[in-house]
């Protein structure tokens, strides 16, 4: 176990600074243009990997900046019921980590703006360990992934993971929480690259009606300990949420509300016509959220 200030954490700052991925390039572009990023999440393989490919194309073409591909897992403790059900459907359709990596390869071969979209693999640590760290990092990098967020891996336990992923030019993204002290936020930021992901509230994922009152304070505290771009997720679902975040964060991550839209539309089947309709609905949602982010930037109270 390591404490804040140990040489381990300082040594990795230079490694992370050297990493250049589509993620860091995209955030640099957003900063230069004065735009807020939108990061949609979908569970890969829900309802099928072919459908996920169509959804990624629609999200990217609508203006998404980074896409999180969820790797389905049988025991998703950090997720609320919506994403838990999505994982169950994806596993039932036969989706594996290897299949998700193949999906990334297919995305990179598209004749679409999606071919250059920044992709984060959003996974529990167990599937990565089952594949083997070195094999996973090599396969993820070769497929065209840009970063990995292992939801249940702590900063203290991540040294080997970070070493191997950084060697394959993969960003390592970690979660900061409202309960994190300033020292803890600094520790998490120091082992992160690409961006720092702040969860807006404690508990599991899921769409909420309003943002927590203490969220601005959390953003200010995080700004005080890192120069990394900051994305906020968990409970973000409405344009109004994104508009508020436009004055505080560099990006908003939206997951459960999109996954719920996929679930509702495909519960009785997922024909090509259904997938097309879902793709159009997801694209419309992203365009609306991007516009809300632009409106929110006019209220920015903390410089990025």
Predicted features and spans:
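Alpha/beta catalytic cores of nucleotide-metabolism and tRNA/nucleoside-modifying enzymes
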Residues: 15-18, 220-226, 237-304
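Hydrophobic faces of well-ordered beta-strands that scaffold small-molecule active sites
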Residues: 38-42, 67-69, 119-123, 148-150, ...
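Alpha-helix-loop-beta-strand connector modules within alpha/beta enzyme cores
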Residues: 82-120, 163-173, 177, 215-228, ...
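N-terminal amphipathic alpha-helix/helix-capping segment at the start of soluble metabolic enzymes
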Residues: 9-39, 104, 297
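Active-site/ligand-binding-proximal alpha/beta "capping" segment
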Residues: 195-251
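Active-site-adjacent beta->alpha loops and helix N-cap segments on the catalytic face
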Residues: 19-24, 75-81, 95-102, 129-133, ...
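Glycine-rich phosphate-binding active-site loops on the catalytic face of alpha/beta enzymes
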Residues: 67-74, 147-149, 154, 198-206, ...
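Catalytic cores of alpha/beta
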Residues: 50-58, 181-189, 236-252
């Amino acid at each position: 176990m390591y404490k804040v200030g140990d040489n381990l954490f300082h040594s990795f700052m230079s490694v992370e600074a050297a990493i250049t991925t589509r993620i860091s390039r995209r955030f640099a572009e957003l900063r230069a243009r004065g735009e807020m990023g939108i990061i949609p999440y979908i569970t890969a393989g829900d309802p099928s990997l072919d459908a996920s490919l169509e959804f990624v194309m629609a999200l990217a073409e609508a203006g998404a900046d980074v896409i999180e591909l969820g790797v389905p897992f049988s025991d998703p403790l950090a997720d609320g019921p919506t994403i838990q059900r999505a994982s169950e459907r994806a596993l039932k359709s036969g989706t594996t980590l290897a299949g998700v990596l193949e999906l990334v390869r297919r995305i990179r071969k598209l004749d679409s703006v999606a071919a250059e979209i920044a992709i984060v693999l959003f996974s529990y640590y167990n599937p990565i360990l089952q594949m083997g760290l070195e094999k996973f990092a090599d396969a993820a990098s070769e497929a065209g992934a840009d970063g990995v967020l292992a939801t249940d891996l702590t900063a203290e336990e991540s040294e080997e993971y970070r070493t191997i992923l950084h060697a394959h030019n993969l960003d390592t993204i970690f979660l900061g929480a409202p309960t994190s002290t300033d020292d803890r936020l600094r520790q998490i930021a120091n082992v992160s690259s690409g961006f720092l992901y702040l969860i807006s509230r404690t508990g599991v994922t899921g769409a909420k009606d309003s943002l927590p009152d203490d969220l601005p304070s959390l953003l200010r505290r995080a700004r005080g300990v890192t120069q990394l771009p900051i994305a906020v997720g968990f409970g973000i679902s409405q344009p109004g949420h994104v508009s508020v975040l436009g004055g505080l964060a560099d990006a908003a991550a939206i997951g459960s509300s999109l996954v719920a839209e996929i679930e509702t539309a495909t519960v009785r089947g997922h024909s090509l016509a259904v997938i097309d309709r879902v793709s159009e609905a997801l694209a419309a949602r992203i365009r609306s959220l991007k516009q809300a982010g632009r409106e929110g930037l006019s209220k920015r109270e903390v410089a990025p």
